[in-house]
């Protein structure tokens, strides 16, 4: 027997009300759900060293998800080349996208300062890893004492050479704060030893391939060269490859920076003496935690020092 029209109307009305209530409850639940976090990681260039930084950042993101239930994305944005113009464009786009935070390894602190200030004005948490802030700009720096790291390396080279001989410094990216500090501190150590003469300071632009090319050219131009120090992670690897190409492994002393797998292989093979290394995974991890805490209105701190480790015979006093 068909239901009366009035009953049908009441059923339809009840169904509509239930649908509206369900939609309202779903919207309320969605609004109450924690919003995802997105942190932008901007290195100097695509590089194996930054892959390790990224691993540390991802580990911190996983910890935040575990503790808060919030989805956390690490948006890795490397410039195609280590050029400040490219890094500036990436930073501009990152600011426009209104992320939960930006961590950046500066290619040129003064030139990027206006963009860093813009991000701060817009309330976007920002910090620097493996770098130093522009003068007077209160940003947290996550990394190590770059001057101490360089002094460890250059003093080791002086000892290996008995305080005498021609040496060269591979510069990395001269405008990058950490590279510039290392070069200056290498030079300060060598200046205290009259028997040491710096004959070349080539630039590798944070590229292993360019470091190899520059090292080959430098050693052909200076056949009496006895030793190398570097300002970046790829420099020592490129020099090691050049020594192998020239058949001069063991004849020219090299003290590197950082402990990428190929660097450690070169040390084990006796091509590179030792290395004064940063801790890139720790830098990535603590950079993300610092950005997250900034988003929770934590006060700004000046520095998070992730330390230095010496690898190779120098670590054993050999």
Language-model region placement:
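Flexible loop/hinge segments that line or gate small-molecule binding clefts
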Residues: 110-148, 166, 260-268, 272
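Hinge/cleft segment of the Venus flytrap/periplasmic-binding protein
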Residues: 33-35, 178, 189-190, 279-318
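Hydrophobic alpha-helical
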Residues: 101-120, 186, 200, 204-265
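Extracytoplasmic "Venus flytrap"
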Residues: 38-61, 75-88, 105-109, 171-180, ...
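Hydrophobic alpha-helical segments within soluble ligand-binding/sensing domains
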Residues: 87, 142-167, 209-212, 259-263, ...
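Short beta-strand elements in bilobed, periplasmic/extracellular small-molecule ligand-binding domains
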Residues: 63-81, 166-171, 187-208
